[in-house]
Amino acid sequence: MGDVVATIKVMPESPDVDLEALKKEIQERIPEGTELHKIDEEPIAFGLVALNVMVVVGDAEGGTEAAEESLSGIEGVSNIEVTDVRRLM
């Protein structure tokens, strides 16, 4: 079994959400078996900034589900979306 790198877009509820606090919460909520690679900011519109969270997980079925569930439960997060999944070589 190999690993994949997945990008999960995390949308804050509003531009008023403290991005640094949100990043810290994301780092603390990464589940066991998931490795946080990096977090990038992506300006959306009207001051809203999404966070692109790159994680490394096993390529088993449902590999990103634990991370998705954990991140979607963070206060201040409107929604999440897996935007990219690539196999690591």
UniProtKB/Swiss-Prot annotation:
Q: Could you identify this protein by its name?
A: Elongation factor 1-beta
Determine if Protein biosynthesis is one of this entry's keywords.
yes
Q: Which Pfam family would be a valid example here?
A: EF1_GNE
To which species is this protein native?
Methanothermobacter thermautotrophicus (strain ATCC 29096 / DSM 1053 / JCM 10044 / NBRC 100330 / Delta H)
Q: Which protein family is named in the record?
A: Belongs to the EF-1-beta/EF-1-delta family.
Q: What other note does the entry give for this protein?
A: Binds calcium.
Q: What does this protein do?
A: Promotes the exchange of GDP for GTP in EF-1-alpha/GDP, thus allowing the regeneration of EF-1-alpha/GTP that could then be used to form the ternary complex EF-1-alpha/GTP/AAtRNA.
Question: What GO MF terms are annotated?
Answer: translation elongation factor activity
Instruction: Look up the coiled coil feature and give its residue ranges.
Output: none
Which pairs are disulfide-linked? Answer: none
Q: Which UniProt keywords apply?
A: Calcium, Elongation factor, Protein biosynthesis
Q: Does the keyword Calcium apply?
A: yes
